Amino acid sequence: MSFVSTPPLSRTPAEAEPAKPIKNDPFYPDVSLEHARDTIRFDGTITDARLRHELLAAIAEVNDELRSARAAWRDAGITCLADVPADQLDGESVRLQHYRRAVYCLAKATLIERYRDYDTTGDGARRADELEPQGDELRRDARWAISDIIGRPRMTVELI
Protein backbone atom coordinates (compact mmCIF):
# COMPACT_ATOMS: atom_id res chain seq x y z
CA MET A 1 0.00 0.00 0.00
CA SER A 2 1.36 3.40 -0.86
CA PHE A 3 0.60 6.78 0.60
CA VAL A 4 0.37 9.89 -1.52
CA SER A 5 0.13 13.28 0.06
CA THR A 6 -0.22 16.56 -1.69
CA PRO A 7 0.62 19.84 -0.02
CA PRO A 8 -2.18 22.35 0.52
CA LEU A 9 -2.70 24.64 -2.41
CA SER A 10 -0.63 27.75 -2.04
CA ARG A 11 -2.28 31.05 -2.71
CA THR A 12 -1.71 32.58 -6.08
CA PRO A 13 0.12 35.92 -6.16
CA ALA A 14 -3.23 37.66 -6.61
CA GLU A 15 -4.42 36.02 -3.38
CA ALA A 16 -1.19 36.56 -1.43
CA GLU A 17 -2.67 39.71 0.11
CA PRO A 18 -5.71 39.43 2.36
CA ALA A 19 -8.94 39.64 0.41
CA LYS A 20 -10.99 42.80 0.71
CA PRO A 21 -14.06 42.52 2.93
CA ILE A 22 -17.43 42.16 1.24
CA LYS A 23 -19.29 45.47 1.37
CA ASN A 24 -22.75 44.82 2.72
CA ASP A 25 -25.96 46.82 2.90
CA PRO A 26 -25.26 49.72 5.30
CA PHE A 27 -27.65 48.21 7.87
CA TYR A 28 -25.57 45.04 8.17
CA PRO A 29 -21.87 44.47 8.92
CA ASP A 30 -19.34 43.96 6.14
CA VAL A 31 -18.06 40.40 5.88
CA SER A 32 -14.36 39.55 6.10
CA LEU A 33 -13.23 36.61 3.99
CA GLU A 34 -10.30 36.00 6.34
CA HIS A 35 -12.58 35.90 9.41
CA ALA A 36 -15.00 33.63 7.58
CA ARG A 37 -12.20 31.31 6.47
CA ASP A 38 -10.79 31.09 10.03
CA THR A 39 -14.20 30.67 11.63
CA ILE A 40 -15.59 27.99 9.34
CA ARG A 41 -12.24 26.20 9.07
CA PHE A 42 -11.53 26.11 5.37
CA ASP A 43 -8.07 25.37 4.11
CA GLY A 44 -6.38 26.71 1.02
CA THR A 45 -8.37 24.47 -1.33
CA ILE A 46 -11.22 27.00 -1.29
CA THR A 47 -10.07 30.01 -3.27
CA ASP A 48 -10.95 33.53 -2.23
CA ALA A 49 -13.04 33.88 -5.40
CA ARG A 50 -15.09 30.79 -4.60
CA LEU A 51 -15.49 31.75 -0.95
CA ARG A 52 -16.51 35.29 -1.92
CA HIS A 53 -19.10 33.91 -4.34
CA GLU A 54 -20.72 31.70 -1.70
CA LEU A 55 -20.55 34.38 0.99
CA LEU A 56 -22.30 36.84 -1.35
CA ALA A 57 -25.09 34.32 -1.94
CA ALA A 58 -25.39 33.66 1.79
CA ILE A 59 -25.45 37.39 2.60
CA ALA A 60 -28.22 37.93 0.05
CA GLU A 61 -30.26 35.08 1.53
CA VAL A 62 -29.86 36.23 5.14
CA ASN A 63 -30.55 39.87 4.27
CA ASP A 64 -33.69 38.80 2.41
CA GLU A 65 -34.93 36.80 5.40
CA LEU A 66 -34.32 39.80 7.67
CA ARG A 67 -36.01 42.29 5.31
CA SER A 68 -39.22 42.80 7.33
CA ALA A 69 -37.36 43.00 10.65
CA ARG A 70 -34.93 45.53 9.15
CA ALA A 71 -37.87 47.64 7.93
CA ALA A 72 -39.40 47.61 11.42
CA TRP A 73 -36.08 48.57 13.02
CA ARG A 74 -35.57 51.38 10.52
CA ASP A 75 -39.11 52.64 11.20
CA ALA A 76 -38.10 52.75 14.87
CA GLY A 77 -35.12 54.95 13.96
CA ILE A 78 -32.44 52.26 14.18
CA THR A 79 -29.88 52.66 11.40
CA CYS A 80 -27.80 49.49 11.73
CA LEU A 81 -28.00 46.02 13.24
CA ALA A 82 -25.35 46.89 15.82
CA ASP A 83 -27.72 49.52 17.27
CA VAL A 84 -30.63 47.12 17.78
CA PRO A 85 -30.93 46.57 21.54
CA ALA A 86 -29.18 43.33 22.47
CA ASP A 87 -26.79 41.79 24.94
CA GLN A 88 -23.10 42.47 24.39
CA LEU A 89 -20.58 39.64 24.35
CA ASP A 90 -16.89 40.32 23.92
CA GLY A 91 -17.73 43.98 23.29
CA GLU A 92 -20.10 43.24 20.41
CA SER A 93 -23.85 42.88 19.94
CA VAL A 94 -24.96 39.26 19.95
CA ARG A 95 -27.14 40.11 16.94
CA LEU A 96 -23.98 40.82 14.93
CA GLN A 97 -22.54 37.50 16.07
CA HIS A 98 -25.73 35.71 15.04
CA TYR A 99 -25.67 37.50 11.67
CA ARG A 100 -22.16 36.31 10.90
CA ARG A 101 -23.03 32.80 12.09
CA ALA A 102 -26.02 32.66 9.74
CA VAL A 103 -23.95 33.86 6.77
CA TYR A 104 -20.99 31.59 7.47
CA CYS A 105 -23.15 28.51 8.06
CA LEU A 106 -25.07 28.99 4.80
CA ALA A 107 -21.86 29.54 2.85
CA LYS A 108 -20.20 26.46 4.33
CA ALA A 109 -23.29 24.31 3.75
CA THR A 110 -23.31 25.27 0.08
CA LEU A 111 -19.59 24.65 -0.30
CA ILE A 112 -19.93 21.22 1.33
CA GLU A 113 -22.70 20.35 -1.11
CA ARG A 114 -20.47 21.42 -4.01
CA TYR A 115 -17.74 19.02 -2.89
CA ARG A 116 -19.80 16.18 -4.37
CA ASP A 117 -18.40 17.14 -7.76
CA TYR A 118 -14.86 17.55 -6.41
CA ASP A 119 -14.02 13.85 -6.12
CA THR A 120 -16.33 11.23 -7.55
CA THR A 121 -14.29 8.14 -6.67
CA GLY A 122 -15.79 5.60 -4.29
CA ASP A 123 -14.03 7.21 -1.35
CA GLY A 124 -15.16 10.63 -2.53
CA ALA A 125 -18.80 9.52 -2.77
CA ARG A 126 -18.65 8.07 0.75
CA ARG A 127 -17.09 11.28 2.05
CA ALA A 128 -19.79 13.35 0.36
CA ASP A 129 -22.47 11.16 1.97
CA GLU A 130 -20.83 11.77 5.35
CA LEU A 131 -20.86 15.53 4.76
CA GLU A 132 -24.55 15.67 3.77
CA PRO A 133 -25.87 15.64 7.37
CA GLN A 134 -23.27 18.28 8.24
CA GLY A 135 -24.67 20.52 5.49
CA ASP A 136 -28.19 20.04 6.85
CA GLU A 137 -27.00 20.88 10.36
CA LEU A 138 -25.28 24.03 9.10
CA ARG A 139 -28.50 25.16 7.40
CA ARG A 140 -30.37 24.49 10.65
CA ASP A 141 -27.80 26.53 12.58
CA ALA A 142 -28.23 29.38 10.09
CA ARG A 143 -32.03 29.33 10.54
CA TRP A 144 -31.61 29.34 14.31
CA ALA A 145 -29.20 32.28 14.10
CA ILE A 146 -31.73 34.21 12.00
CA SER A 147 -34.45 33.35 14.54
CA ASP A 148 -32.18 34.62 17.32
CA ILE A 149 -31.61 37.91 15.47
CA ILE A 150 -35.32 38.67 15.16
CA GLY A 151 -36.30 37.18 18.51
CA ARG A 152 -38.38 34.36 17.03
CA PRO A 153 -38.41 31.11 19.02
CA ARG A 154 -36.43 28.23 17.57
CA MET A 155 -38.52 25.30 16.48
CA THR A 156 -37.73 21.83 15.23
CA VAL A 157 -40.58 19.84 13.70
CA GLU A 158 -40.38 16.22 12.60
CA LEU A 159 -42.90 14.32 10.55
CA ILE A 160 -44.08 11.26 12.44
Regions found by a protein language model. Give the residues of each.
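Conserved short "hinge" loops at termini or chain/domain junctions
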Residues: 1-84, 144-160
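Charged, low-complexity surface segments at secondary-structure and domain boundaries
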Residues: 37-43, 84-92, 127-131
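Amphipathic alpha-helical interaction surfaces
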Residues: 61-68, 90, 109-117
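Short, exposed interaction segments that mediate macromolecular assembly or regulatory contacts
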Residues: 75-99
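Short loop/turn elements at secondary-structure junctions
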Residues: 95-160
